[in-house]
């Protein structure tokens, strides 16, 4: 049986409006959990260094844990020339929406299937070609 253990909530900067800020979990441990905890040595604490045993979360260093979000935001002008930027802004704008892109792919795929089926020769299907060889008799001499 699993037992729940109540821990003290950690104050994390930036989570003041979060649902986990400052709420305590009121749980009474079961008698089996209490008896198990008395058998264990109480002097040892579980500690893992950053990166050791696949622990990569540090509440004291949130910026390095979650990543530098401001690193990739840039207000610099576009590295492309004006004509190229205008072309992509004009002709690629309809494909920024998922629905329009899906419609374009469906219409393009449907027209490709229609073209291939219209240009295919009609005698590709075996039912149109008919038998090519005389029938071979089976094990009892029957067709």
Curated annotation (Swiss-Prot):
Belongs to the psaH family. It comes from the Eukaryota. It is a single-pass membrane protein. Residues 1-48 form a transit peptide. GO terms for biological process: photosynthesis. It comes from Hordeum vulgare (Barley). It is found in: Plastid, Chloroplast thylakoid membrane. Keywords: Chloroplast, Membrane, Photosynthesis, Photosystem I, Plastid, Thylakoid, Transit peptide, Transmembrane, Transmembrane helix. Possible role could be the docking of the LHC I antenna complex to the core complex. GO terms for cellular component: chloroplast thylakoid membrane; photosystem I reaction center. This is Photosystem I reaction center subunit VI, chloroplastic. The chain crosses the membrane at residues 100-120. Its main location: plastid.
């Amino acid at each position: 049986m699993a037992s729940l253990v109540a821990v003290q909530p950690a104050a994390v900067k930036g989570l003041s409006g979060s649902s986990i800020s400052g709420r305590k979990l009121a749980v009474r441990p079961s008698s089996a959990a209490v008896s198990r905890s008395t058998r264990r040595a109480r002097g040892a604490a579980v500690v893992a260094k950053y990166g050791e045993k696949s622990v990569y979360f540090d509440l004291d260093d949130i910026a390095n844990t979650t990543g530098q979000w401001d690193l990739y935001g840039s207000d610099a002008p576009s590295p492309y020339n004006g004509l190229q930027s205008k072309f992509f802004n004009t002709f690629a704008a309809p494909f920024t929406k998922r629905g329009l892109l899906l419609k374009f792919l469906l219409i393009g795929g449907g027209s490709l299937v229609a073209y291939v089926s219209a240009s295919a020769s009609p005698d590709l299907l075996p039912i149109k070609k008919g038998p090519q060889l005389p029938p071979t008799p089976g094990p009892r001499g029957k067709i």
